[in-house]
Amino acid sequence: MNTVRSEKDSMGAIDVPADKLWGAQTQRSLEHFRISTEKMPTSLIHALALTKRAAAKVNEDLGLLSEEKASAIRQAADEVLAGQHDDEFPLAIWQTGSGTQSNMNMNEVLANRASELLGGVRGMERKVHPNDDVNKSQSSNDVFPTAMHVAALLALRKQLIPQLKTLTQTLNEKSRAFADIVKIGRTHLQDATPLTLGQEISGWVAMLEHNLKHIEYSLPHVAELALGGTAVGTGLNTHPEYARRVADELAVITCAPFVTAPNKFEALATCDALVQAHGALKGLAASLMKIANDVRWLASGPRCGIGEISIPENEPGSSIMPGKVNPTQCEALTMLCCQVMGNDVAINMGGASGNFELNVFRPMVIHNFLQSVRLLADGMESFNKHCAVGIEPNRERINQLLNESLMLVTALNTHIGYDKAAEIAKKAHKEGLTLKAAALALGYLSEAEFDSWVRPEQMVGSMKAGR
């Protein structure tokens, strides 16, 4: 039995594995781009299949493709979407910057599978052509950016945003639950005036709420599709209604608000929509990194750190120190945030490097974008499930640190002035006294006045958490 078969493209014949659906151009790419291990993301492959499915339907409706061929292409695309042909898409991220080879990989797989569905024999009889039928009314230059936007929007809506909302809700519940716990604040890693633990966490909640708004603000641009622009944005070789109809069809089959891009030249020449959307993801990464760092600092200890909160003990933390437990969820989250920030640099460089009518950094851009979405979504889910929901206050430690803080002296500013208050704090620190003892020793106020004026619970403003 033959292990290879001959496939042809415009450059001639080439042997491909007999058991594979791909054709000549995919094989050439496999042989010419054996670079690293990163493959085209499955979600991008599925977005390409969705795009081809929608195009076949619209081409049929416009009388440009027979019902028989269109139906076979759609059935083949549905098989790809069901995961039946995942091993038919082996191409590397590091290929042509337009994604042409992955577009042709999809065209060849769908054409060969559709031909089989129509009774053809693989490698012997082509009833559906990869270019003339599957790629009808299309160019790689508008197909690949369309698939990028489809994959990106669906990932943001279905993966990232739900996890962001869940984590925000968890922290909001913690903020409300801890609204009456007065603790010492810290600025510059030094003691500061008091606030409540609920107020502190409310800041985290507000950060995430702003991140959600920024991400949602970017979605309409991502929902704009390049399909119909063909090679350079002019729409050469397309029906006048094709672009609008294919965007409408994609909106229907994905239940997402896709529209045809109002300017196809921008849609082909830039990656601006994903650059801007990823900027919002970078902002989310910055916020999550700050939150994770705060959590692990507040939970540091258990005896020699800040120790104001406890977090779940999920696994042993050391191979040499018995009983040690580390803030591993915080560490995982901060690492992935660093990766997202690195991805943002690469996406910015790729987005800025397009020339004339086409950006040719697209595979790298979408690879990094989808990785960032996946990392952030998975990271938030893990952090929420294994850390945030289990945050609990250590009230005894909180009260100890609060009562030992010299910054409670700030409450005296309006009564005896900044200079005298500072003198009290310095004397207390230098001589190891309490603030009250130092104040009384200096004779600046009476014991009754100190007890009346230095009351931490009255120094936090509204006891509400700012929600």
UniProtKB/Swiss-Prot annotation:
Enzyme type, top EC level: lyase
Pathway in which this enzyme or protein is active: Carbohydrate metabolism; tricarboxylic acid cycle; (S)-malate from fumarate: step 1/1
Function: Involved in the TCA cycle. FumC seems to be a backup enzyme for FumA under conditions of iron limitation and oxidative stress. Catalyzes the stereospecific interconversion of fumarate to L-malate.
One family name in Pfam for this protein: Lyase_1
Protein family (similarity comment): Belongs to the class-II fumarase/aspartase family. Fumarase subfamily.
Protein name: Fumarate hydratase class II
Induction / repression: Under conditions of iron limitation and oxidative stress.
Enzyme Commission code: 4.2.1.2
Organism encoding this protein: Escherichia coli (strain K12)
Note: There are 2 substrate-binding sites: the catalytic A site, and the non-catalytic B site that may play a role in the transfer of substrate or product between the active site and the solvent. Alternatively, the B site may bind allosteric effectors.
Binding site for substrate: 98-100, 126, 129-132, 139-141, 187, 319, 324-326
Recorded name of the encoding gene: fumC
Cellular compartments annotated: Cytoplasm
Catalysed reactions, semicolon-separated: (S)-malate = fumarate + H2O
Subunit and partners: Homotetramer.
Residues at the active site: H188 (proton donor/acceptor), S318
GO molecular function terms noted in the UniProt entry: fumarate hydratase activity; identical protein binding
GO biological process: fumarate metabolic process; malate metabolic process; response to oxidative stress; tricarboxylic acid cycle
Temperature-related behavior of activity: Thermostable.
Site positions for Important for catalytic activity: E331
Signal peptide positions (record): none
One GO cellular component term: cytoplasm
Keywords (A to Z) from UniProt: Allosteric enzyme, Cytoplasm, Lyase, Tricarboxylic acid cycle
Keyword hit for Lyase: yes
CDD domains named in the record: Fumarase_classII
